[in-house]
Amino acid sequence: MSRQVFCRKYQKEMEGLDFAPFPGAKGQEFFENVSKQAWQEWLQHQTTLINEKRLNVFEPEAKKFLEEQREKFFNNDESVEKAEGWKPE
């Protein structure tokens, strides 16, 4: 049986991640509070943002922007950036 977590994005019990997505306390927080589905959706959204905004993920400003967007995404904040001209299916 898969590990279950109370997903902070969907506010319900869902299948959890198999491992922390990155090291440290923040990675552990996501491991404990974000579902596998929500994390996959974030990865898709992040990729769209990187491509549409032509972000260099090695630049501190881009990293900060993505961290802020990640928090907004998982908190269901309406101000999360959307790629211009992109329409979800």
Swiss-Prot record:
GO molecular function, one term: iron ion binding
Pfam families registered for this protein in UniProt: Iron_traffic
Keyword list, A-Z: Iron
Keyword Amino-acid biosynthesis: no
A Gene Ontology biological process term: cellular response to oxidative stress
GO cellular component: cytosol
NCBIfam families hit by this protein: PRK05408.1 (NF003817)
Annotated family: Belongs to the Fe(2+)-trafficking protein family.
Role according to the record: Could be a mediator in iron transactions between iron acquisition and iron-requiring processes, such as synthesis and/or repair of Fe-S clusters in biosynthetic enzymes.
Descriptive protein name: Probable Fe(2+)-trafficking protein
